[in-house]
Amino acid sequence: MNFLTVGHRGVMGVEPENTLRSFRRAEQAGHDQVELDLHLSKDGALIVMHDAEVDRTTDGAGLIRDLTLDEIRGLDAGFGERVPVFEEVLDAVGVPIQAEIKDVAAARVLAGVLLERGATGRVSVLSFHDKALAEIHALLPEVATVLVAEELGPHIVPRAQVVGARLVSLDIRRLNLDTVRRCHDAGIKVMAWTVNTAQDWAVARALGLDGAATDLPAEPAA
């Protein structure tokens, strides 16, 4: 594949993160994909938000798992934006989506939505949590899985292989050529997060990465 640019939570560097406004801006900016995060509400809706609680990014407070969809709908996520559910993002943008999940329960609900919406070929599922990825891979083996990790080492390749991931997403600050080569030799592509500065982009290309997640609409001038 060509070098893939992914709008991290949309373009969270300039728009309220994980909102429809942010995802649309990322698509308009020309990013190949958008990345988002999912948590389950008290009543089982797939809420698009990074944190487990609503405090940081809205005018509300509390854990997502303790709030109903209606309660979350009433919150302001910035510039008057509402917190979306996953299905709304599917409808709002045409580019492929990287959906990050945190647990097995979210994996099961997401699998159902992907089947219902016929989106198994359009959405790839990311996670730091191997069990969540393994669940998606077991339920929907046709869906692309992406292992996200902070720590590097020889364990990255076998971890990815166990959960069926053909792409890993790693911290640009810790990535090195040895890890990239090890992954590529195993047929696993490598992207980095979060690539924002001109130096970050230079490192990403020098390492021969396959893609990068960024908070910004465009690569900054060197």
What residue ranges belong to the model's regions?
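Phosphate-group recognition and catalysis centered on beta-loop-alpha active-site segments
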Residues: 1-222
